[in-house]
Amino acid sequence: MVPEQIDLIKESWAKVVPIKEAAADLFYDRLFELDPTIRPLFKKDLTEQKRKLVAMLNRIVALLGDFGALVHMAEDLGRRHVQYGVEAKHYDTVGAALLWTLRTGLGAAFTPEVEAAWTAAYRTLAGAMKEAAYGVPASAMKKAA
């Protein structure tokens, strides 16, 4: 990621924070719409999970300038998520739900440049998470799928 992309993510995230509860609702609604088989991985009441999602995204955005810390955090997150039953195939669905949520929440502010920045960030994070969780580089997983 280049500095301009980091700036775009930080600027766009600042616009999401005031609507964070609605954004979390949109995200989980879309996630379960895209893949209903993911729903059983979560508790019935998503209140705490939604809070954790927003807190994690806040942390990710804050760490964007520190690539080493960001990757370390993503690796730890990946190892934890595999224990919850998350499979490698779920990462694409989560990414699609995240981008859809940002597009819906930001409207016209979700420009192609903003989308490219968020896509690059998500690919980096998801790649580090999958590698830590499954011990296989993300590039090798794509080839196997």
Q: How does the language model describe each region?
A:
Residues 1-145:
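Globin-like tetrapyrrole-binding proteins
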